[in-house]
């Protein structure tokens, strides 16, 4: 195989091309590739960190929701207890008011009964006196009538006491 000038020229041109590429193209190209790789690695780490952070925030949110649920149950329980206490208090007050009204009504009934009994006694006394006067007027024997009148007066005085 003969080495001629064309092949030798092509080898020299190729070597110069490789040297030129290594000196002016390869370094910037490799730095761009390395920079891109570094950005990709940083992005992956950032994604991993963000994923961990989002998981932490999610867990915090779940814990917060549990606390809110527990607190809402406590509030509902407290409201129920307050409702029951208010109902119990209102019921006791209603019973007290009922007892007060009943006692006042009983007092009024007793007073009215006493008043009516007193009026009836007075009315009966007047009737007895009137009837006694009529009997005395029509009676023949006045001594018996006086005894009768005294007896009625004593009975009436016993009723009034």
From Swiss-Prot:
Superkingdom classification of source: Bacteria
Membrane topology designation: Single-pass membrane protein
This protein's GO CC annotations: plasma membrane; proton-transporting ATP synthase complex
Cellular localisation: Cell inner membrane
Primary location recorded for the protein, binned into one broad class: membrane
Pfam hit, one: ATP-synt_B
Described function: F(1)F(0) ATP synthase produces ATP from ADP in the presence of a proton or sodium gradient. F-type ATPases consist of two structural domains, F(1) containing the extramembraneous catalytic core and F(0) containing the membrane proton channel, linked together by a central stalk and a peripheral stalk. During catalysis, ATP synthesis in the catalytic domain of F(1) is coupled via a rotary mechanism of the central stalk subunits to proton translocation.
Summary of subunit composition and partner proteins: F-type ATPases have 2 components, F(1) - the catalytic core - and F(0) - the membrane proton channel. F(1) has five subunits: alpha(3), beta(3), gamma(1), delta(1), epsilon(1). F(0) has three main subunits: a(1), b(2) and c(10-14). The alpha and beta chains form an alternating ring which encloses part of the gamma chain. F(1) is attached to F(0) by a central stalk formed by the gamma and epsilon chains, while a peripheral stalk is formed by the delta and b chains.
Protein name: ATP synthase subunit b
Phylogenetic lineage: Bacteria, Pseudomonadati, Pseudomonadota, Gammaproteobacteria, Enterobacterales
Gene name, Swiss-Prot/TrEMBL: atpF
């Amino acid at each position: 195989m003969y080495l001629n000038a064309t092949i030798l020229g092509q080898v020299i041109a190729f070597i110069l091309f490789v040297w030129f590429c290594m000196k002016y193209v390869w370094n910037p190209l490799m730095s761009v590739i390395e920079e891109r790789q570094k950005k990709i690695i940083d992005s992956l780490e950032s994604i991993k960190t963000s994923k961990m952070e989002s998981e932490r925030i999610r867990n915090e949110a779940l814990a917060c929701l549990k606390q809110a649920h527990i607190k809402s149950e406590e509030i509902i329980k407290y409201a129920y207890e307050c409702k029951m206490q208010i109902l119990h208090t209102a019921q006791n007050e209603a019973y007290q008011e009922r007892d007060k009204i009943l006692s006042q009504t009983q007092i009024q009934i007793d007073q009215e009964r006493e008043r009516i009994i007193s009026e009836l006694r007075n009315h009966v006394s007047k009737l007895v006196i009137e009837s006694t006067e009529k009997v005395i007027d029509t009676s023949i024997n006045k001594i018996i009538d006086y005894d009768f009148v005294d007896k009625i007066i004593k009975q009436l005085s016993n009723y009034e006491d």
